Amino acid sequence: MSLVEKNTASEDAFALSEATARDYLVLLKPRVMSLVVFTGLVGLVLAPGHMNPVLAVISILCIAVGAGASGALNMWYDADIDAVMKRTRKRPIPAGIIAPNQVLAFGLTLSAFSVMTLGLMVNWLAAALLAFTIFFYAVIYTMWLKRSTPQNIVIGGAAGAFPPMIGWAAATGEITWDSLVLFMIIFLWTPPHFWALSLFTTNDYEAARIPMMPNVKGELSTRRQALFYAVLMAPVGVLPWVMGFAGMFYGVVSTLLGLAFVYYAWRLWAADSQLQMLAAARKLFRFSLLYLAGIFAVLLFEALTFKLLAAFGVF
């Protein structure tokens, strides 16, 4: 059975209701999109030189649309497991609001539009990175890794790490070591973030037969690996300051937040009861969001401040 047949064969089973603009917005996974747009914006602003403001806005919009397209394609393919999991069963396809083939067409149209617009209006390197990101998330992660290996988040996390590289490439037309460091921060952040989530949503993933780390390797192994990636991530998070494309303020904030991240991961690893483990997993999950938002916010603040002062001739 082809991929299209997989999700259209049972389409008659959906008692479709009239879809609204809000329902199509849900397909774009707006929460995920907001993080993608934010990190892409940081990459664009942090990049050296000055970019035409109109092209900058176009770049960010294309990154947002591309991210939304990935989300729609993910929901199209994952409609069967979304119907099983508590936190996803109200999404438009399992809820019977939008037909699978309409979601597929929506996702493919947005994908083509975002990539072609970015290429024609900005540059083709950024467009190629955006196209690869959409492909990696929708095909490599969603259709293959997610259902086949407990390392799905580790490898698949690359999809969420590309946006700052896309923003950087849009501004400079280049891939540099600096942009690769931004990629690595998010790449190493992803496993402990999602494994913390999976530790207190294990039943959901098990019901959907998704091989998340706790379901396959057990909770102790998951906690150990979350700590391992946190320890790897913390020093990488300081590299923007070490390499000279972030300031001292960022260096201090990233160091403190990195140490706190390791502490929360250690608390999770050291938990000696199920109740303590679940509490520690929730704390790590919440703090991981604060960590990523915090360090990228500081990067953005420093970059905007420096460019504003430079515009007034201070530097």
UniProtKB/Swiss-Prot annotation:
Protein's GO biological process: heme O biosynthetic process
Transmembrane region(s): 32-52, 53-73, 93-113, 120-140, 153-173, 180-200, 226-246, 249-269, 295-315
Membrane topology: Multi-pass membrane protein
Subcellular location: Cell inner membrane
Entries under CDD domains matching the protein: PT_UbiA_Cox10
Matches recorded under PANTHER family: 4-HYDROXYBENZOATE SOLANESYLTRANSFERASE, PROTOHEME IX FARNESYLTRANSFERASE, MITOCHONDRIAL
Additional remark text: Carbon 2 of the heme B porphyrin ring is defined according to the Fischer nomenclature.
Name of the featured protein: Protoheme IX farnesyltransferase
Native source species: Brucella suis (strain ATCC 23445 / NCTC 10510)
